[in-house]
């Protein structure tokens, strides 16, 4: 995947949109990168809070936050508008990982850099063959003055219209 084979190693983007696999193992990518203790890829090991090797390596059983870190590494920092990311996650990205572990470090890094603009809770049954709760994370590295230090939480769980005919477990669309 793009975690171990970055197709755009030195490119930055204005807008990035993705829906990474939920709960999918990224062990193959981890092995290709050299194993958990050996990763030196600057997308996943950075300097933060005085730690020269602040690690953002998650459990190999769920790589969705790793895909977000990959996107964060591709934000434009030298332009007036910077970059904006919208990425769909299941609920595990909000709470997995103990303090000091990769998932927790990623969330801390995002919050301390004030990149998280909003989290939108979507209606259940929005995706084919899964009824799990999903959330859109909106991130930017150029918040407006009035939005700095704030994160907007949007409950859109009731903003749906039912489908006439189910598509697997998908039974509604965002309205």
Predicted regions and their residues:
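A conserved structural/catalytic subdomain of Rossmann-like adenosyl-cofactor enzymes
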Residues: 4-175
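SAM cofactor-binding core of SAM-dependent methyltransferases
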Residues: 1
